[in-house]
Amino acid sequence: MPPKKKKITAIIKLQINAGKATPAPPVGPALGQHGVNIMEFCKQYNAATESQAGNVVPVEITVYEDRSFTFVTKTPPAARLILKAAGVEKGSGTPHRDKVAKLTPAQVREIAQTKLPDLNATTIEAAEKIIAGTARSMGITVGD
């Protein structure tokens, strides 16, 4: 007889700095209300993301009926990667009027390759268009 599948009670999505998960908010309250061992999650998450230090890494935590959990880390948000590549602190308040930085097509391609597994795109060209659109909506121009 095959083993029984665990019943899922919750799926929690968080964005946490890589290698810096602590039981303090926002991690503690989000996991605590589902009865998850918070310290155990923090240790596992920090070990899994220590190589990406300095980035915000989204994580999807699946909580099961017996209070056990599994998690999947995603790629950093496109907006964060764009800001880092452009070397600016934040995007423009009025993106269509004020431009704050410029990205080269090579930088856009690099970000698109990083984000491809999490994007709704099958080709690198489609991923580049998505990243370029995100950059434009932040007041960052794309071109040579």
Swiss-Prot record:
SUPFAM superfamilies: Ribosomal L11/L12e N-terminal domain (SSF54747), Ribosomal protein L11, C-terminal domain (SSF46906). It comes from the Bacteria. GO terms for molecular function: large ribosomal subunit rRNA binding; structural constituent of ribosome. One or more lysine residues are methylated. The keyword Disulfide bond does not apply. GO terms for biological process: translation. PROSITE patterns: RIBOSOMAL_L11. The keyword Iron does not apply. CDD domains: Ribosomal_L11. GO terms for cellular component: cytosolic large ribosomal subunit. Keywords: Methylation, Ribonucleoprotein, Ribosomal protein, RNA-binding, rRNA-binding. InterPro entries: Ribosomal_uL11, Ribosomal_uL11_bac-typ, Ribosomal_uL11_C, Ribosomal_uL11_C_sf, Ribosomal_uL11_CS, Ribosomal_uL11_N, Ribosomal_uL11_N_sf. Gene3D superfamilies: Ribosomal protein L11, C-terminal domain, Ribosomal protein L11/L12, N-terminal domain. Part of the ribosomal stalk of the 50S ribosomal subunit. Interacts with L10 and the large rRNA to form the base of the stalk. L10 forms an elongated spine to which L12 dimers bind in a sequential fashion forming a multimeric L10(L12)X complex. Belongs to the universal ribosomal protein uL11 family. Forms part of the ribosomal stalk which helps the ribosome interact with GTP-bound translation factors. This is Large ribosomal subunit protein uL11. The lineage of its organism: Bacteria, Bacillati, Actinomycetota, Actinomycetes, Frankiales.
